[in-house]
């Protein structure tokens, strides 16, 4: 009983974390938003079940359906069953499809497994569920899952799928099987290829009118044999003998959640003959089939893979000014998990790119991880009914602005500080954007090098800077004085690569100021355009003023 309570608490905690933040909508706004999304999902359902086509990726559909359920719970609306098909002309299942409960994580699975024995793991094949009924050794009927109790008659379609045995013998001669009709794949690696909208493709082929040779691109994975042999090994052997070989190949005995996690990770990265979206753990001991009911299976659970892409709600649109003066747009998100990373922000790009995406707070966007784990936007999957977009700042900044602090220069000024403190420039370890903001807010820097004048006492008394860290920071600031001349010039934003600057062999400020355009133009990777930028940079009044200030501080290379 205690274990069951622990499982319940785990599930409730997971659900509450997922549903904790409800939109701050008025009742009228909530009704409008829920109604719009409800209508869209109904349209997708109609397309899926009546036309056999899908206008939306499976993963997006699943996540937006979950979002609708969340909103309905937030505002006391009646929830809907996901993908409930029409029941016109439906056929009763000899044995009900129970569905499978999802485990939130490995801990929840471990609690579930603790009170059970003789457990087995199978891939959660991504396709469309079906009942296969054999009578007197022949395929008698095939029924779509439907609502679990009734489904559509798919017999004629399934008879055209060559991978489904049409005749069986022995224990299966009079049997009812449940499984997944799937799209045959050769070497499908889930980690790399994702879901490829497999479920919708299978549904499309099965719902399409007329017989089609394309049905031979389908096969079946049997995952249940109600009232079959008591021993799982016997069950698997008989299924394999009858032609359902995949079940035996991809069913493994497991003792604990660690073993399940190992197999789950293996199948996530392995070449498989089908698309999967997780694993199913099931007990060999099952109740008699007459007790099977939709939503009431306690002998099996699923542990799904984390989606390659997540639907995230945009909470705010923010603008940032980089050190070069370019304005970039960032979307703040309701947190989502991707590959064990908590994603709360995603870079949209330029203002123009943001306007092309047409993203506003309240919209739902599809986010995935690009190279090196950087979040990216794949699509805008849902736009809110009421959309208010912020006004971007005026484009008054460029590569020669904001070396000196001012109210309008706040963001570019901070970006310059972050840049000069980076490893490739002055290498000021232990301070990032938050630290620079704290220092500037307290000590009101005049320009980007004002931090050189801070005393140990000032650093120690800076709110937001730990006292234990202030001495280390002062030491870093003093060490910066010993950095080579070229590093300081880079900190000043000279429009050259480090390689070009090193090739110039410039070792003093006075030498640099007297160098002509032709000199800069001959440097590797520079060219006439970049050379003119260097001339414009070194003749800028703010740059000259900074050079004089560094000379007064006796920084190497700037002395008269």
Swiss-Prot record:
It catalyses: NAD(+) + (deoxyribonucleotide)n-3'-hydroxyl + 5'-phospho-(deoxyribonucleotide)m = (deoxyribonucleotide)n+m + AMP + beta-nicotinamide D-nucleotide. Gene3D superfamilies: DNA ligase/mRNA capping enzyme, Helix hairpin bin, Nucleic acid-binding proteins. It is an enzyme of class 6 (ligase). The active site is at residue 124. InterPro entries: DNA_ligase_AS (IPR018239), DNA_ligase_B (IPR020923), DNA_ligase_CS (IPR033136), DNAligase_adenylation (IPR013839), DNAligase_N (IPR013840), NA-bd_OB-fold (IPR012340), NAD_dep_DNA_ligaseB (IPR050326), NAD_DNA_ligase_OB (IPR004150). Keywords: DNA damage, DNA repair, DNA replication, Ligase, NAD. SMART domains: LIGANc. GO terms for molecular function: DNA ligase (NAD+) activity. One of its GO terms (biological process) is DNA repair. Its EC number is 6.5.1.2. NCBIfam families: PRK08097.1. Catalyzes the formation of phosphodiester linkages between 5'-phosphoryl and 3'-hydroxyl groups in double-stranded DNA using NAD as a coenzyme and as the energy source for the reaction. Belongs to the NAD-dependent DNA ligase family. LigB subfamily. HAMAP family: DNA_ligase_B (MF_01587). PANTHER family: DNA LIGASE (PTHR47810), DNA LIGASE B (PTHR47810:SF1). This is DNA ligase B. It comes from Escherichia coli O81 (strain ED1a). The gene is ligB.
